[in-house]
């Protein structure tokens, strides 16, 4: 049968070494070949190639239309970011051409648009890039081969906006049974807004406990995924790194003189996609017994081009290339402890009162992994994404007012 004459049919990309696929950025050329191996001569109608890049989001929400009527509302949106078509083999005359047995290679190349979105895989959306080859033959079904490729858009943290220090202050009145127990204040700052994976954030903070009970300061890097469709939004939050300080006694003050918080290997910020965003923030909070947490949030941008001392563009390009190499091949240390759930950092439940650790490990194995940050990367060896929380239990309260930095 003609179907059995095709021994191999695949798409291969140039630049792959030792089984590691290349990583692309906007404006680069994607080149490769379609491999067709025949056991005997075969007639072929056409060989066509299509490259696509698409950002897609989808989620459902339960709605109520009365006391006894419920329905499910679906939200979906997609954006095409790459679209390329090419015919690699077409018969000169007639409807088919005959290929001899053996190995046949059909080269292809196309240019990516100058601006793209980083490959991403989330619970309610994704950004995926792929190349599909289709072999048309008479009287048999078409044969298809698919190749997924990864795009990482450069995010240079060596810009004035991302090099600017970030600081803030908050205070809250501690209450218990409607009694005023004193004022707790928090101020924090970091040296810049932009960081890259593997860097350490030195956290400077001052915690002034004017209440009558001990308080516990903590800090965490939180990732927020925002999905947008038809005017609606869906958010998922995850703690990717955290630290806990020592309790601050009544009437005492504590200073953090650059407490180290290391950024794990996470995906970069995605800020310019119409249907999804990936944002990061440093959240410093103080657990106050009997009162909702005092929370201060400082924005972060996770980039791909690390901080360099001289600001040369050649250095930026080299640093970005180094990031891509580390991202694909870098040997990481042994897998660390999984970070805590987002709700454990910001929820109002006082875990300390139950005698539990402020950062318990997740117990449900089915919830410990929701898929890689990037699509279809077999060699991606970063830690699995942390657990997610559907809602933000810490809306800003009216009694939170700014306070001058003192540290």
UniProtKB/Swiss-Prot annotation:
A Gene Ontology BP annotation from the UniProt entry: protein transport
GO CC field: cytoplasm; cytoplasmic vesicle; plasma membrane
Record gene name: ARRDC2
Membership in a protein family: Belongs to the arrestin family.
Taxonomic superkingdom: Eukaryota
SUPFAM superfamilies: E set domains
Organism: Homo sapiens (Human)
Name this protein carries in UniProt: Arrestin domain-containing protein 2
Assembly mode: Interacts with WWP1 (via WW domains).
A Pfam family: Arrestin_N
